[in-house]
C-alpha cells in the first residue's frame, strides 16, 4: 500500500457521515465531550459560525459567542471524536465567507439576520 492509501483508510474510520450542512452565519449548538477528573460529560457550546476552513477530515468551524460581555471564539474540528453532536439552531443570512467583522461590533450590532429558505 502506498502512503496515501494508508492515510485515506485511517481518515475513513474517523469521518462522520451524519453531520448537518453547516453554513457561515448559522447559529449552532456543538456538544463537546469534556473530562472532569474521572467523569466525562457533554458540554454544549452555542454560537454563530464565523468561519469554515479546509475540507474533508480536516474541516474546522470557528464559533463565536458573547459570554459575560466578552467575545469567546472556539475552533472545532468537526470530525473529532470529542465532538458528540452538532445541531443547527437557526440559519443566518450573510454575504461573506468569513464574518471576522463581527469581532469589532458590540451588542445588537452582532446579530445576523435569519434565513428561512434553507432547512435546519
From Swiss-Prot:
User: What InterPro entries has UniProt attached to this entry?
Assistant: Ribosomal_bL19, Ribosomal_bL19_CS, Ribosomal_bL19_sf, Translation_prot_SH3-like_sf
What Gene Ontology cellular-component terms does the record carry? Answer: cytosolic large ribosomal subunit
Q: Which UniProt keywords apply?
A: Ribonucleoprotein, Ribosomal protein
Keyword Transmembrane included in the entry's annotation: no
| One GO biological process term | translation
Q: Which domain of life is it from?
A: Bacteria
Question: What Gene Ontology molecular function terms does this protein carry?
Answer: structural constituent of ribosome
Concerning its family, UniProt says:
Belongs to the bacterial ribosomal protein bL19 family.
HAMAP family, A to Z = Ribosomal_bL19
- Function statement: This protein is located at the 30S-50S ribosomal subunit interface and may play a role in the structure and function of the aminoacyl-tRNA binding site.
Q: What is this protein's name?
A: Large ribosomal subunit protein bL19
What's the source species for this entry? Acaryochloris marina (strain MBIC 11017)
- Lineage per the UniProt record: Bacteria, Bacillati, Cyanobacteriota, Cyanophyceae, Acaryochloridales
Amino acid at each position: 500500500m502506498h502512503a496515501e492509501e494508508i492515510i485515506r483508510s485511517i481518515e475513513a474510520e474517523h469521518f462522520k457521515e451524519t453531520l448537518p450542512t453547516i453554513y457561515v452565519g448559522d447559529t449552532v449548538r456543538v456538544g463537546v465531550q469534556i473530562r472532569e477528573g474521572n467523569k466525562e460529560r457533554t458540554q454544549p457550546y452555542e454560537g454563530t459560525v464565523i468561519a469554515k476552513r479546509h475540507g474533508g477530515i480536516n474541516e474546522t468551524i470557528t464559533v463565536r459567542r458573547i459570554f459575560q460581555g466578552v467575545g469567546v471564539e472556539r475552533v472545532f474540528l468537526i470530525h473529532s471524536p470529542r465532538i458528540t453532536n452538532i445541531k443547527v439552531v437557526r440559519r443566518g443570512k450573510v454575504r461573506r465567507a468569513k464574518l471576522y467583522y463581527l469581532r469589532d461590533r458590540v451588542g445588537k450590532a452582532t446579530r445576523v439576520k435569519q434565513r428561512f429558505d434553507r432547512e435546519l
